[in-house]
Amino acid sequence: MEIVLAKRAGFCFGVKRATQMAFEAAEKEGETFTLGPIIHSPQVVQRLEGMGVKVLSDLEGIGNGTVIIRSHGVTSAELEDAVRRQLEVVDATCPFVKKAQEHVKRLSHDGYTVVVVGDADHPEVQGIVSYAEGPVHVVGSGEEAARLPNMKKVGVVAQTTQSFETLKNVVKECLLKGGEIRVFNTICDATAVRQDEAKALAREVDCMIVIGGFNSANTKRLAEVCSELQPRTYHIETAQELDASWFQGVERVGVTAGASTPKWLIDEVIERIQEFDNKKKG
């Protein structure tokens, strides 16, 4: 059985940067915290917890130490709270997310009603929205955008892991809603490239394995686009979840992974698939 690993499987630039910053901070003296999980990988979070890094939902009761801002970013109020408490702040916010936050702040300041294309419940979107000084709407599709009120000036940004197709559909609707529109494509290139690569791979294999946290938006989207082309697509977090029956009659298996999936997890999955194959041959 041939195992084909996608070239861009695993950590993206922003996640790699954030995890490096987190592990470096963990090695220093004093208490270290992250506001929410540093990335959407339970296994990486566990490793950091093993080094003494505590995951907090808020800073209530924290008077000293180092707080790491997760790769998805936090709200402006949470960042201000950390500064007010005189904590040492290690800002591991992905630069692409940071750019979206800055666009929202500037658009809002200039009198635009802001439309954020994304998932309203996602921490990245909640952080982006918090930088708006005026009206702001979150929409996840063109259909939702069609229900927006008419607006004089509209400014559009996107969650970094959104699909370009969704952004286009929302922009089309916003063109009908406002007299003036400004659009910033804040989708991370890595997201689109990974999805295109995964789709191409899914067409060429008999089975597709997508590795990443079940709480990871970009991993879930990878699994979705793969399953549209290859029904035998399986989304897993760890090698332990693999099932030998998935590979019956399979000659080529494709493997890809979300932007928050570490290399060691990918290696473990590939090793496990190889074990299944060796048993089959033996």
Curated annotation (Swiss-Prot):
Keywords: 4Fe-4S, Iron, Iron-sulfur, Isoprene biosynthesis, Metal-binding, Oxidoreductase. Isopentenyl diphosphate binds at H40, H72, H122, S216, N218, S260. Dimethylallyl diphosphate binds at H40, H72, H122, S216, N218, S260. It comes from the Bacteria. GO terms for cellular component: cytosol. Its cofactor is [4Fe-4S] cluster. Its EC number is 1.17.7.4. The active site is at E124 (proton donor). It holds the Pfam family LYTB. It is an enzyme of class 1 (oxidoreductase). PANTHER family: 4-HYDROXY-3-METHYLBUT-2-ENYL DIPHOSPHATE REDUCTASE. This is 4-hydroxy-3-methylbut-2-enyl diphosphate reductase. It comes from Geobacter sulfurreducens (strain ATCC 51573 / DSM 12127 / PCA).
